[in-house]
Amino acid sequence: MSSSNPRGIPPAQFFEFKELSMEEAQGHLEKFQEAIAKYKFMETSVVRRVASLDDKIPDIRKTLQSVQFLKERQGDSFTVTYELNDTLNAKAEVEAKDNVYLWLGANVMLEYTVEEAEALLTQKLNSAEETLKACKEDLEFLRAQVTTMEVNTARVYNYTVLLRKKTKM
């Protein structure tokens, strides 16, 4: 596994020690817990982004397929069945035109030529898939960092237990 992350997530260092005082050990334990909390927060954020992209990518793909269908049928008319409600469908005769309207979100809809729409949707799909791949890499990296910090915590905690046993004797 690489020791660095291309998106700036700091790597966790494996903590090497020979002897620590109880105060030093407690200080390290606090730092480790803080680092674990930061990594978990980043992980939660990345998981949300992955979920969002998992929702968006099929929609973009479906819209792109529709635009490509319109491009193939340009100038022809065809019948479509569309959903009005959960239990109500309707049929319509549609003539494929040179322009399409794409819903961009935030109450914005723009008119594009079929070629422009196809290029835009292809670019958006590629971008979303690359972002999803990067997010999955980040998740793997973050989970490895959390594991490293948990191992550090366990080692220092076990050392403090050993110190307590020695002081009781």
Swiss-Prot record:
A single cellular component GO annotation: cytosol
Coiled coil stretches, renumbered: none
Keyword Cell division: no
GO molecular function terms noted in the UniProt entry: tubulin binding
Entry's family note: Belongs to the prefoldin subunit alpha family.
The protein's role, per its UniProt record: Binds specifically to cytosolic chaperonin (c-CPN) and transfers target proteins to it. Binds to nascent polypeptide chain and promotes folding in an environment in which there are many competing pathways for nonnative proteins.
Protein name: Probable prefoldin subunit 3
